[in-house]
UniProtKB/Swiss-Prot annotation:
This is Vacuolar protein sorting-associated protein 54. GO terms for cellular component: cytosol; endosome membrane; GARP complex; Golgi apparatus; mitochondrial membrane; mitochondrion. PANTHER family: VACUOLAR PROTEIN SORTING 54, VACUOLAR PROTEIN SORTING-ASSOCIATED PROTEIN 54. Residues 1-14, 30-44 have a biased composition (Polar residues). The modification Phosphothreonine is found at residue 74. Present with 2540 molecules/cell in log phase SD medium. Residues 286-321 form a coiled coil. GO terms for biological process: ascospore wall assembly; Golgi to vacuole transport; intracellular sphingolipid homeostasis; protein targeting to vacuole; retrograde transport, endosome to Golgi. Residues 729-744 have a biased composition (Basic and acidic residues). It comes from Saccharomyces cerevisiae (strain ATCC 204508 / S288c) (Baker's yeast).
Amino acid sequence: MSISETPHNKSQGLQKAAGRPKIVVPEGSPSRNSDSGSFTIEGDTSLNDDLLSISGSVTPRARRSSRLSLDSITPRRSFDSRTLSVANSRSFGFENETHSGSMDFSPLGNNSIYEIVMNTRRKNWLNYPTVADIPQVSLSKNDLDDHWKTHVIEYVKNIKSDYQIFQSTNNIRNMNQMEQLKELREGENMHEESFEANLRQGDAELINSIPDFYFSDKFQLDNPRTFHKVLDAIDLFLTKLDMKRQAERDEAFSELRDRLNDFLDIVETLLVTEISKSSHKFFHALSEVDNIQKRALDTMSELKELAQNIKTIDAENIRKKISHLEMIFKRKNVEKLEQGLLQAKLVLNKTDECKSMYEENKLDNCLELIKSIDYLIKGDDSINEDVQSWTRCWPYKLSNLRTIPALSATREFLTNMKIEIGGKFSLQLSILLIDDLRSFCKSIKPKETLHRIQTGSNDKKQTIFTDNFSSKITELIVRLNRCEELTSAFDLYREKSITELKSIIKIYLPTENAHADNNHDEKHLNNGSTSGSKLSRLIKEQTPAEFQSMLVNIFTHALEALRRLYGHQKLLLDISLNELASVKSPNENQHNMITQLDIRTGINEIIRIIQLRTGKIIAVRRELNLSLRYDYFLKFYAICVIFIQECEVLSGEFLTKYLSNVLASQIKHYANAQSSKNYRNIKKKIDAEEWIPYIVDSSIQSDVNDIVSSIDIDPLSWTTILDMVGGSHDCENGRSEDKEKDEGNETYQGHRKSVVVGDKTFVASSSLLATIEVIKELMVLSINLPSIYLSNFEKLCYDALQYYNSSAMASVTQPGNSLLKTGRNLSIMGESLDCLAEFVIIVQRFYQRLSNSNRDFEPFDASHYTTLLGQFQASSNKIYMANAPPPPV
């Protein structure tokens, strides 16, 4: 690399093309006329170009003349005429300071002020270019495809490593010259050490004369600090570009150029010296390369021949070893086949042994042996100890014989045997649980059950089991789990329990005696009647007390059985889950059958069946129940409600509405039937009434007192009717005792023939007492039956009172609305009407109180009762006027 000495033409030199610096050497420079030829440097400086310039000239002066001036680095004007030239014309060099000398341009000489001001030399320098200036060039068509950017990017990536190597070796600024010189000197012989030491000392002095920042990796000339270091206190007068400073500027340029050329000469000289020292080694290495290549070819041919020989030998050895291995494998396969036959024979022998155990009823040993045979068929000896002891001396692993068709019959036989054993265990479990269920139900009497339910006590007897019973259940569940029949055993018990609960109803159904059976059998055989009609007839022939007793026995027995079944459910579920959790290697079906171990679904099915069947039994006596006395009907209602509620408590859900619907239908029909029955009773009593004072029993007066007190509170004797344990019996016993006491004291107290209602006393009649009994029954039914029927019973009370008034007056009234002269004491009738008028007010206030506690009940309007009181008052006045004495004269 060289820098031109002449800084005159500043515009020539560094040109900017595509953003990179470009150094152009003019044609007229001495370097182009030198022997080394001309060269152009673009971009970064090249080491090879520097060597070329050094080799073309020996003297430093000649090399200095070939270098460009720093004037080329300075910025130039856009239209400087010194940079313009035409094709094939001679470019003016940096040192060409002469002109043509013609006086046509300036009479004052070259470069005169006149020439500069008038611009006589280059008047037409800004003319348009011609064909001579710019020759015609045929532009090529751009045939780039659409993906040219992708191709360029890929190409740049491919040459990136090569470019980095080139840049690191071709840029002198990125090289550490001292390290390269040191590496070159390490290869010299020992006899040149003294000469090299002296030369190294001289080279070091030359290198030390160059400032260190030129060898820095971060050398950047565009950095102001670096640029000032390069100038080294040389003033180029760049801020004053006038002609007055031109001479000083030229001297500064020359000084800077000379200094830089000296630095370059030092580096080039050292590089050429070091390279020339190693040139003979390079040629020696080239001569040895040919020899190495020849030897490498010979070695490759020998290696190929050796590889072929080794391949032949290996193939022969491999064939022998393969043949040997095939014989070994064949022998092992034969041994495995023999062991498999022994395994199959052992399976058959153990199966026969298992069959004999089953015939001897050794079920546990048989089940254990079946399990071991199953492992033997699977070829698994890792778990079962029996299989390990049977095959301890066998050399090979057991085979899986499950896919062998010859053993399919044996496997099926073992499976069936396991199922039969599980069936026996299941039957034992069901029998044990059913016996416990029966003994539990027998140990509890119906009264105890009713007392427990009505008092709300929970003795938890259903969950108490003896240790012996629990241990037996545990043993059976363990056996069932071993034979994988646990779920089927629970299903069997579920079916057995349903059958057992069905039989409870059959136990308490009515039956005929032997004599009656013969007569009725002959009659029914002739008529072709079915057993169902016979049972219906027997149910209808029962007395109310017998029917009630049958329902109580069925319901209490069934409830205790259901309680015990829920205890069985908890016990079985706890033991089963513990057994499943204790198994070390659970079966694949054990996790899926946990939900199948709960017998709750069977218990719920039992509840549905019992309610359905008892509902049908009750429906058979639907017509007969309409004529029941009110206390028997309430007992019937109470036991049905108790059973329905207890079933709901036990199951936790309302399973069926059948029994509830049957009971609701019975209540509705019973309430509707009360109207005609009451009319008949009242009509019968009035028709037979003689209107004479009637003896009032103490029980009747007690009922009247209860009716009066019902305005404020429910009488105790009315609410205890629903007590199934014995409250109503105590009440009846008390009444009979009072009656006997009154009869015993009759001779001393006389006959009581009046009814006391509050603070009023009325002479009693037979029809009055019968009507009071009707009113009492309706009020008792109103308190104890659901509130939805209150409106019906209020209407019945209202109609009964109204009907008594109309019937009584009709019995003593002529067609002309005048009273008959029958000779009977009509004042007794008036007393009865006045007494019932008091009951009208009591009935009104009674149902008004019930409406306050029952939002779904709306009582009669007060106007209805006012009208009824008016009717009673009119009848009483009419009777009074008929019996009044004539007025005095």
